[in-house]
Amino acid sequence: MAKGGFPGGFGGGNMNNLMKQAQKLQKQMEDMQKDLETKEFETSVGGGAVSVTVTGKKEVKSINIKPEVVDPDDVEMLEDLVLTAVNEALRKAEEETASKMGKLTGGMPGGLF
């Protein structure tokens, strides 16, 4: 490791260069976050019986339930379908966020940003 530098040459010991890189990375992360917030993630379960759309902000935007799955004698099944669909849509949003963040910060020590 170079004296005063970071593993892999990040910054190369030049504090001014390191600050410029950090500012550039911060701007890229902000842009990526704005882009993700406008994206929508949809999933459906039960053969399309229940579909859910969430935003990149991880807010539920819509839940669609086909009338034929509404059975007053089996509310628990419908609850399970809705829960599964919501969790799957949120998982997709989280995976996309983690993937993009990983590409942007790849190789940096954890907790740096």
UniProtKB/Swiss-Prot annotation:
Annotated keywords: Cytoplasm, DNA-binding
One Pfam family this sequence matches: YbaB_DNA_bd
GO cellular component, one term: bacterial nucleoid
Residues forming coiled coils: none
Disulfide bonds: none
Gly residues bias (residue ranges): 1-14
Classification via InterPro entries: YbaB-like_sf, YbaB/EbfC
One function term, GO molecular function aspect: DNA binding
Region annotation (Disordered) ranges: 1-31
Subcellular location(s) per record: Cytoplasm, Nucleoid
Major location (coarse): cytoplasm
Family: Belongs to the YbaB/EbfC family.
Role played: Binds to DNA and alters its conformation. May be involved in regulation of gene expression, nucleoid organization and DNA protection.
Quaternary assembly: Homodimer.
Protein name per the record: Nucleoid-associated protein CLL_A3446
Source organism of this protein record: Clostridium botulinum (strain Eklund 17B / Type B)
